[in-house]
Amino acid sequence: MDYNYEDKQPDTGKAAFIAPSADIIGDVILGEDTSVWFNTTVRADLAQIRIGRGSNIQDNCVVHVDEDTPTKIGDNVTVGHNAVLHGCTVGNNSLIGMGAILLNNVVIGNES
């Protein structure tokens, strides 16, 4: 479900799949062919979240931000089940494993 937050609304334009139980909130930009799976929350209430094309955020994940600390997920990234990404940057063609926790200002490079 998409939710506006204040004056920001999600841009889910060409996403491949958003599960009915996923919540996309605020200033979120989903790239082409991106998927967000069941019971995942992507909440951009304090800063922007950008998820690149071809990426997938699997079941039960949380993607969030802090004030002035956006979350940026590159192209062709897989985020495994139950992961938490908070105010971090993940480079292109990367895999974030199941249950991983990435907190503010963490940077994961390309091809990781």
Language-model segment annotations:
Residues 14, 19-20, 25-26, 31-32, ...:
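Left-handed beta-helix
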Residues 1-16:
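Extreme N-terminal tail/first-helix region
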Residues 2-4, 24, 48:
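Residue-level preference for alpha-helix termini and adjacent loops
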